[in-house]
């Protein structure tokens, strides 16, 4: 199984051994979110621990910059005078997403994503990818644990 936002070439080329795990991915993901409140995390930003410790203001500054950039992207998507993508129902899709997930549908920060992160820790242990179940606090620099968006 492959979890990805972009369909692999083998799938788009119609390879007979490559198929979707769920026939209607969007409906399945939305139903899972309704039941669990979990939407898989898409990305994480990594900085070497020694570098973060040598530059103690860096983690917070990076978090702040990414948060501000996200707000710019949100505002850009909300601009309806000129569509940002050539999809006829993009505004309705944005409205539907907000109705389901709230205005901040890509949440930043450890606490805002704790449920998702704990599931990742559980799954990586259950699937044998790590020898012991890690705690969320073990994989993030201490200075980032309480950062929240403003």
Region locations from a protein language model:
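Generic preference for flexible, low-structure residues
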Residues: 15, 61-63, 68, 78, ...
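Residue-identity detector for threonine
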Residues: 4, 12, 28, 36, ...
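Pocket-lining segment of extracytoplasmic ligand-binding domains
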Residues: 1-78
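General structural signal for secondary-structure boundaries
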Residues: 20-25, 32, 90-93, 109-115, ...
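Long, low-complexity C-terminal extensions of enzymes
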Residues: 109-150
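Generic secondary-structure boundary/loop-capping signal
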Residues: 18, 30, 36, 48-49, ...
């Amino acid at each position: 199984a492959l979890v990805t936002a972009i369909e692999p070439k083998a799938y788009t080329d119609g390879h007979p051994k490559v198929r979707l795990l769920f026939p209607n991915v969007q409906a399945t993901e939305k139903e899972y979110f309704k039941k669990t409140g979990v939407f898989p995390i898409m990305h994480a930003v990594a900085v070497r621990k020694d570098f973060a410790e040598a530059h103690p203001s860096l983690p917070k500054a990076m978090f702040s910059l990414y948060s501000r950039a996200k707000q710019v992207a949100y505002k850009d998507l909300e601009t309806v005078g000129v569509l940002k993508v050539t999809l006829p129902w993009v505004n309705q899709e944005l409205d539907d997403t907000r109705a389901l997930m709230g205005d901040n549908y890509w949440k930043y920060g450890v606490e805002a994503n704790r449920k998702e992160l704990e599931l990742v820790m559980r799954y990586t242990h259950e699937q044998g990818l790590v020898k012991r179940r890690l705690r969320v606090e073990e994989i993030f620099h201490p200075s980032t644990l309480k950062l929240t968006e403003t």
